[in-house]
């Protein structure tokens, strides 16, 4: 029993859901169809003269457009608008704010319009006078986040019918609209009602008579014996037939002319959009090329830095000791070349001048003996090393030993000041002849 009740409830729920979705789809289809008929009527009758609020066709079109923009609009919210009702104007005000040179701010500042419904109706008229209605709707539809926030899932603005609507509204740019925004029609208190009767009239074929003609022919058939066998066939002359054909062709021509203007306006809009997209594409292409060139420059700079760092690392790696050995040889050569003057002084001048003596304040010769031993060790190491052998112990980095050697060399006084060292405190000669090497500096 309970299972059957649950199944019945589910079936009723599914059927009600299907009925609801069908009703919403029918509402969308009816509104889009009647909007198409209304636009065609405006294009047919007012391509050569402006339209104002006195036109019944415009009043009906404004009502249709208001119903479309209000279709499946989310419920009233008292905190959002000043009159306690949230209408489509609140959606237009947010979604169309990105349109360049829009009329939203001017409508907001109108003193005689206070309610959201009145502002929405004023916006419809201003957008038609600006001939930018399709642009406003297209921009609003691009803001999908705001559209989902204001409309339910089955609304026209949330379905593909909205794209059809924007295409239909492009043709209105061929019409000149002229409205006065100060009137009772913009009070926003009375709801609008769509008049469907202009679009539901049955177009009777010319092969049959009207109701009055049928009555007249029926009455005449009862009184006259020479009545036609087929009372429903029209009794028209050739002139009436040609006039009716001409009138029908004229109507077709006007419709085709209106469609031609609509298609031309649509082509112009698409061309302008294509030009904008091409300009945007060129701008993005230039940005892409500039970014690629900058990336190449940065890549080359980074490659140069990497090569420089690799060269520095190669110089610091202890595997190749040739530069270090060459520097050690140069250092040994310089140290050896500095001592012959001291040897000449010790041998020649010491033999010729035996009266040289040391003063009491003579400096210790330990630094000189250390430097001499360093020179002899360097010569012995340089001569005893073969070309194939590495400098220093095998498998051991010689850099720390060289660092210590550099420190010891820096502490030894230079032989450049040897003459002053000899003349001031170290050596004194009693020979009357002065030697250039022993003269005071």
From Swiss-Prot:
Q: Name one GO biological process term.
A: positive regulation of cGMP-mediated signaling
Which regions form coiled coils?
262-317
Q: Where is this region: Interaction with RAP2A?
A: 1-293
Give start-end positions of Polar residues composition bias. Answer: 367-379
PROSITE patterns to which the protein is assigned, alphabetical: RUN
Keywords in UniProt for this one?
Answer: Coiled coil, Phosphoprotein
Q: Where is this region: Disordered?
A: 211-234, 367-399
**Covalent S-S links between cysteines:** none
Residues recorded as bearing Phosphothreonine in the entry: 210
Q: Which InterPro entries match?
A: Run_dom (IPR004012), Run_dom_sf (IPR037213), RUN_RUNDC3A (IPR047338), RUNDC3A_B (IPR047340)
Phosphoserine modified-residue sites = 227, 411, 414
- Residue span(s) of domain RUN: 52-184
* Compositional bias annotation for Basic and acidic residues: 380-389
List the Pfam families hit by this protein, alphabetically. Answer: RUN
> Organism's domain of life?
Eukaryota
The function of this protein is: May act as an effector of RAP2A in neuronal cells.
What does the similarity note say? Belongs to the RUNDC3 family.
Report quaternary structure and partners: Interacts with the GTP-bound form of RAP2A.
Q: What is this protein called?
A: RUN domain-containing protein 3A
Species of the source:
Bos taurus (Bovine)
Q: Write the gene name.
A: RUNDC3A
